[in-house]
């Protein structure tokens, strides 16, 4: 398999971070002019980086669909590569001529939306003094309160920080889009879903454990909309991505001039898990350029705090650099260093959780970070096959974007959520991340 690999790229500016925002604008330099560099310039072994290629290429040869990898070190993209195919299937049938993956291919980020849309927005609002993470959720969403018949009470005590740390008591998910499962909260209308979100009952007492929650991040997206008076997609695109000059990071891209062929395909047969799932209005075509997540697509019109964002390697490199710069890029300050530190600090009860971000807080996170990341590394994953790693100790950022769900479901009747692509090392992330760290000298 021929791999499109570039070890030399346009430089990304590594900026010093100044705590006062007004000082930053006066002292920051312009973007460094593009330079031709090799991996050794950034203290990487070209030979060992080739092992990363070989690892992914082996998976491609064995049936893994495709991937794009970008690595940022010391303010420069030192590796960007495309592997395999952006689309191999049309429905259940293999294409005679699968579409090759390109480094500019755009991906459904799935739950990385939580970080690079919702968290970025929240971090900006906190930095501007418009949001207090220690304030009650109900202060921003008055409808967020206990309902008659709720077995577990206490929504009036839940703070924004509890939701960010995934210890609010909210359930992991909810099937709004399926009438049999949602009952009175069935909704395939965005406004109605937002109303119902505040009424979903708690699953456990706040603060007693960490349960990763899409519902929590859907609510956080609603808080952004309430505070800004703008839909989440409009706010993030105007206030975050436009100042950064990002052209390929957005919600609902097919409604904004992009074509399906520009995207990595996800599930082969819509949301049917190879034909075993049914609900009203379910998609059955191969998904390409539409958000895969059911709650986001059917119940939130493609725009939600937990899923829906698309991006590509070049844009992700800049977003990684913003975090490495603790909020700034070029002469733009999205949020200040104090806010960046607040959001990436470990939870007192579980060091693998920060405010939204996942941290390399214990060996339990080795599947994502590998064994060599620093204890202060943080990042996130997305169900469709995306992982991002930010390691301040090494001034290192990694985005591995895959379309691992663009493969058959292994056993639809037994478990409709396990795809062939999940079983490959590339789709499990940790081995690729480990090889990248081992290439550093």
UniProtKB/Swiss-Prot annotation:
It comes from the Bacteria. InterPro entries: Beta-lactam-related, Beta-lactam/transpept-like, Diverse_Enzym_Activities. The keyword Hydrolase applies. Its EC number is 3.5.1.28. GO terms for molecular function: N-acetylmuramoyl-L-alanine amidase activity. Belongs to the peptidase S12 family. PANTHER family: BETA-LACTAMASE-RELATED, BETA-LACTAMASE-RELATED DOMAIN-CONTAINING PROTEIN. This is N-acetylmuramyl-L-alanine amidase.
């Amino acid at each position: 398999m021929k791999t499109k690999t570039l070890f030399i790229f346009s430089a990304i500016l590594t900026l010093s971070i100044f705590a006062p925002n007004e000082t930053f604008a006066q002292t920051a330099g312009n973007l460094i002019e593009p330079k031709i560099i090799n991996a050794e310039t950034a203290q990487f072994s070209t030979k060992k980086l080739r092992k990363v290629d070989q690892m992914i290429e082996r998976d491609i040869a064995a049936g893994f669909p495709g991937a794009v990898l970008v690595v940022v070190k010391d303010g420069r993209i030192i590796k960007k590569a495309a592997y395999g195919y952006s689309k191999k299937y049309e429905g259940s049938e293999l294409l005679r001529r699968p579409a090759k993956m390109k480094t500019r291919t755009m991906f459904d980020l799935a739950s990385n939306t939580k970080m690079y849309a919702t968290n970025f927005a929240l971090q900006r609002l906190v930095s501007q003094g418009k949001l207090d993470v220690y304030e009650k959720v109900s202060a921003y969403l008055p409808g967020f309160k206990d309902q008659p018949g709720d077995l577990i009470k206490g929504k009036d005590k839940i703070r924004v920080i509890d939701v960010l740390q995934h210890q609010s008591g909210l359930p992991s998910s909810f099937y709004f889009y399926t009438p049999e499962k949602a009952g009175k909260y069935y909704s395939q209308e965005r406004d109605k879903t937002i109303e119902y979100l505040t009424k979903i009952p708690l699953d456990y007492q706040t603060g007693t454990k960490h349960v990763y929650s899409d519902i929590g991040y859907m609510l956080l997206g609603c808080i952004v909309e309430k505070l800004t008076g703008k839909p989440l997609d409009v706010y993030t695109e105007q206030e975050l991505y436009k100042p950064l000059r990002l052209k390929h990071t957005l919600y609902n891209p097919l409604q904004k001039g992009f074509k399906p062929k520009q995207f990595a395909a996800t599930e082969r047969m819509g949301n049917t898990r190879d034909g075993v799932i049914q609900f009203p209005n379910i998609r059955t075509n191969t998904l390409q350029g539409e958000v895969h997540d059911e709650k986001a697509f059917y119940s939130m019109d493609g725009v939600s705090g937990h899923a829906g964002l698309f991006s590509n390697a070049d844009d992700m490199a800049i977003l990684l650099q913003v975090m490495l710069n603790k909020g700034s890029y070029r002469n733009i300050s999205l949020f200040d260093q104090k806010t960046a530190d607040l959001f990436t600090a470990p939870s007192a009860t579980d060091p693998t959780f920060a405010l939204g971000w996942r941290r390399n807080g214990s060996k339990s996170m080795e599947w994502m970070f590998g064994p060599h990341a620093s204890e202060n590394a943080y990042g996130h994953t997305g169900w469709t096959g995306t992982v991002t790693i930010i390691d301040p100790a090494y001034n290192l950022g990694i985005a591995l974007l895959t379309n691992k769900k663009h493969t058959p479901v292994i056993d639809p009747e037994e478990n409709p959520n396990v795809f062939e692509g999940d079983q490959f090392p590339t789709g499990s992330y940790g081995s690729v991340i480990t090889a990248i760290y081992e290439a550093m000298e």
